[in-house]
């Protein structure tokens, strides 16, 4: 397992380098002065042309691109991501505040999808071709077909505007910093984010359970006189759970990408809304850096998928 883990980690290195090279190249092609993306805008606007040129020389902005890339990559490793052109804020500080919010939202969506998707699929498999099974199948198709932002608007209208049970946006109440307060703000966006995955898991759980029910070892267990409860839980569900969990974890990178739209709908202060705000303001340094961070987070999520898959299915390690 250690050898497999090391191999997967080493495979990340060239991928991360490619991402950083692309981001650096795009930043270099942006119109305007590269110095304005390196220092705070207020400081840049107060400098004369002579001072700007002297600073460009001292910071190596006139050096060949490959030297600039090495220096820029080294600054990234130290947490120096530059400054926003629209707000003048340090991009690293912006990320430090936004990234944890997106991670919290994604993990909650994953938990919601895992619990409800597997539960609904489990029940549907036991009630095959019953009205409950047809309702579950129809709901799954609806959950997969309708975009997440529609559910977001619908949830806001029902639970915030009409019922007034939950806040329509934000991350926490001013002056209150507790887990349950943040949970109150996260429950709607996380549920909307996880609806598609819940529907997918429900259908996959049902089909996997039905497939396992037809296996010879399940028939043998019934022939031995085991109770239906023991057959389902110990022989059917246990053997069906491994591929189901693989599907659940494999969708983690897609959840990270889906936060962009959901955070905008609920005005949730995470990475997704940060990217959209930067695009609206034409703040390309922030757009490129946040895109790079999301891509790297997605790569690490994919690494977790590979490791989790290998833990559940040892055959993967030897492929």
Explain the meaning of each model-derived region.
Residues 2-3, 99-132, 176-319:
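Alpha-helical transmembrane segments of integral membrane proteins
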Residues 18, 22, 26, 116, ...:
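Alpha-helical membrane-inserting segments
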Residues 10-14, 18, 65, 107, ...:
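Membrane-interface helix starts
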Residues 2-24:
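Hydrophobic secretory-pathway targeting helix
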Residues 137-200:
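Membrane-water interface segments at transmembrane-helix boundaries in multipass membrane proteins
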Residues 16-70, 163-181:
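Hydrophobic alpha-helical transmembrane segments of membrane transport/permease proteins
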Residues 23-27, 32, 152, 156-160, ...:
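Juxtamembrane/transmembrane-helix interface segments of polytopic membrane transporters
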């Amino acid at each position: 397992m250690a050898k497999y883990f090391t191999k997967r980690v080493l495979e990340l290195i060239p991928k991360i380098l490619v991402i950083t090279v692309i981001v650096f190249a795009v930043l270099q092609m942006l119109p305007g002065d590269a110095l304005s993306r390196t220092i705070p805008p207020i400081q840049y606007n107060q400098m004369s042309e002579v001072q700007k040129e002297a600073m460009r020389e001292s910071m190596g902005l006139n050096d060949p691109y490959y030297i600039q890339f090495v220096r820029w990559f080294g600054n990234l490793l130290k947490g120096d991501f530059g400054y926003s052109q629209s707000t003048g804020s340090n991009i690293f500080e912006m990320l430090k505040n936004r990234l944890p919010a997106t991670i919290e939202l994604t993990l909650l969506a994953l938990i919601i999808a895992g619990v409800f998707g597997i539960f609904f699929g489990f029940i549907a498999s036991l009630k095959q071709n019953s009205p409950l099974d047809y309702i579950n199948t129809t709901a799954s198709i609806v959950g997969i077909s309708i975009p997440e932002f529609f559910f977001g608007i619908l949830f806001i209208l029902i639970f915030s505007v009409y019922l007034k049970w939950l806040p329509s946006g934000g991350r926490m109440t001013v002056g209150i910093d507790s887990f349950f307060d943040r949970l109150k703000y996260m429950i709607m966006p996380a549920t909307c984010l996880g609806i598609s995955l819940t529907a997918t898991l429900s259908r996959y759980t049902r089909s996997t359970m039905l497939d396992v029910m037809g296996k010879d070892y399940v028939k043998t267990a019934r022939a031995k006189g085991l109770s239906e409860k023991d057959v389902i839980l110990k022989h059917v569900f246990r053997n069906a759970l491994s591929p189901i969990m693989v599907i659940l974890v494999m969708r983690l990178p897609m959840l990270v990408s889906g936060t962009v739209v959901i955070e905008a709908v609920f005005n949730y202060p995470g990475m997704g809304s940060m990217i959209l705000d930067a695009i609206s303001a034409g703040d390309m340094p922030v757009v490129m850096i946040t895109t790079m961070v999301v891509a790297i987070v997605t790569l690490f999520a994919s690494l977790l998928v590979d490791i989790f898959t290998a833990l559940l299915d040892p055959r993967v390690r030897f492929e």
